[in-house]
């Protein structure tokens, strides 16, 4: 959030990958002002610092949460609904600011809407409510695992290494037609919560 820190971070830098944000939906409901200050204020500071320091390309983390109450499946970038949390609103606002900085200041950007990132060393007790590490923790500790509803609700996912690769490709692309847009980053399929749990049990050789 500190302007001077953002300016110093971008000095002499050609490419920026902005992944920093507060990520808990429940916490955003309790602390909407703080989330706006960090997620939006910090993002705009980094955009301005990138312009001031002639950064070549800027990629950033958006979120599948911007789809809100839009029922269309599969999700397509052009169809978003009403945001359902302050966190989602900050991510949608970031996309709007990115478009403005592209149009007004000529900054080259790409945004990525991640779907449920998972991967090694993910903290099951962290603020990011990720179902896979919660399942793994429960199975390994042989503790109860709770599934809401009938477990047939579906989600899409993003392996963390794929998120890294899309950021690298986004920073380095020279395709002008690809710039100044947002993209879904996911497997491109739907997996039920029950399927995820059974797969985790199978992979961990648990009864």
Whereabouts are the PLM-identified features?
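Conserved NAD(P)H cofactor-binding loop of Rossmann-fold oxidoreductase domains
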Residues: 19-23, 62-63
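Serine-hydrolase catalytic-loop signature spanning alpha/beta hydrolases and amidase-signature enzymes
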Residues: 24-28
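Catalytic helix-loop patch of NAD(P)-dependent Rossmann-fold dehydrogenases
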Residues: 30-48, 52, 56-57, 66-111, ...
């Amino acid at each position: 959030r500190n302007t001077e820190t953002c300016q110093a971070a971008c000095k002499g830098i050609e490419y920026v990958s902005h992944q920093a944000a507060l990520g808990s939906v429940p916490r955003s409901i309790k602390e909407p002002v703080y989330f706006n200050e960090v997620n939006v204020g910090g993002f705009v500071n980094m955009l301005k610092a990138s312009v001031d320091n002639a950064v070549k390309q800027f990629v950033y983390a958006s979120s599948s949460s911007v789809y809100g109450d839009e029922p269309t499946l599969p999700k397509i970038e052009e169809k978003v609904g009403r945001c359902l949390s302050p966190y989602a609103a900050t991510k949608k606002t970031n996309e709007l600011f990115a478009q403005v900085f592209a149009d007004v200041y000529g900054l080259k950007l790409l945004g990525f809407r991640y779907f449920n990132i998972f991967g090694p060393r993910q903290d099951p007790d962290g603020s990011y409510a990720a179902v896979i590490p919660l399942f793994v923790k429960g199975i390994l500790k042989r503790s109860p695992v709770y599934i809401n509803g009938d477990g047939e609700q579906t989600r899409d996912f993003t392996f963390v290494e794929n998120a890294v690769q899309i950021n690298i490709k986004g920073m380095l692309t020279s395709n002008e037609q690809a710039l100044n847009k947002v993209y879904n980053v996911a497997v491109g399929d739907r997996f039920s919560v029950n399927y995820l749990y059974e797969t985790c049990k199978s992979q961990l050789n648990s009864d």
